[in-house]
Swiss-Prot record:
<feature type="binding site">
    <location>
        <position position="104"/>
    </location>
    <ligand>
        <name>ATP</name>
    </ligand>
</feature>
<feature type="binding site">
    <location>
        <position position="59"/>
    </location>
    <ligand>
        <name>ATP</name>
    </ligand>
</feature>
<comment type="similarity">
    <text>Belongs to the NDK family.</text>
</comment>
<dbReference type="InterPro" id="IPR036850">
    <property type="entry name" value="NDK-like_dom_sf"/>
</dbReference>
<protein>
    <recommendedName>
        <fullName>Nucleoside diphosphate kinase</fullName>
        <ecNumber>2.7.4.6</ecNumber>
    </recommendedName>
</protein>
<keyword id="KW-0547">Nucleotide-binding</keyword>
<keyword id="KW-0597">Phosphoprotein</keyword>
<keyword id="KW-0418">Kinase</keyword>
<keyword id="KW-0963">Cytoplasm</keyword>
<dbReference type="GO" id="GO:0006228">
    <property type="term" value="P:UTP biosynthetic process"/>
</dbReference>
<dbReference type="GO" id="GO:0005524">
    <property type="term" value="F:ATP binding"/>
</dbReference>
<dbReference type="GO" id="GO:0046872">
    <property type="term" value="F:metal ion binding"/>
</dbReference>
<keyword id="KW-0479">Metal-binding</keyword>
<comment type="subunit">
    <text>Homotetramer.</text>
</comment>
<keyword id="KW-0067">ATP-binding</keyword>
<dbReference type="InterPro" id="IPR023005">
    <property type="entry name" value="Nucleoside_diP_kinase_AS"/>
</dbReference>
<keyword id="KW-0808">Transferase</keyword>
């Protein structure tokens, strides 16, 4: 088993519904450590930059509007197989297909407002972490 880091966003819908603590509890209960965290209200430019890979997709404008509609929590998670572990905790992208007990199954209302984002691979995790956090903002936990 490998200790990995992954990136997570609690999206505006879940922040507005006060699900931050419950979601953090799920991360920690699954053995993931939160080693960096902050609340930000994304600008249009930040959202467009973060989701640049989707810029040609028809949903891009709506995604940017949603992600700038309110504050988000961004965090770095660390643990064994963190990328896969977080994706399992999140559940299917479409909440209608997400199992109960997953974040999207329990907290998401629609595919457009699906509560959380998580990196899909180690490479994207490294890129996404660097987008929001400087090296000195990430605090490895040794205890």
């Amino acid at each position: 088993m490998a200790i990995e880091r992954t990136f997570s966003i609690i999206k505006p819908d879940a922040v507005a519904k006060n699900h931050i603590g419950a979601i953090y509890n799920r991360f920690e209960s699954a053995g993931l450590k939160i080693i960096a965290s902050k609340m930000v209200h994304l600008t249009k430019e930040q959202a467009e930059g973060f989701y640049a890979e989707h810029s040609a997709r028809p949903f891009f404008g709506a995604l940017v509007s949603f992600m700038t509609s309110g504050p988000v929590m961004v965090q770095v998670l660390e643990g064994e197989n963190a990328v896969l572990a977080n994706r399992e905790i999140m559940g299917a992208t479409n909440p209608a297909e997400a199992a109960r007990g997953t974040l999207r199954g329990d907290y998401a209302a629609s595919i457009d407002e699906n509560a959380v984002h998580g990196s899909d691979a180690l490479e994207s995790a490294a890129r996404e972490i660097a987008y929001f956090f400087s090296a000195d903002e990430v605090c490895p936990r040794t205890r």
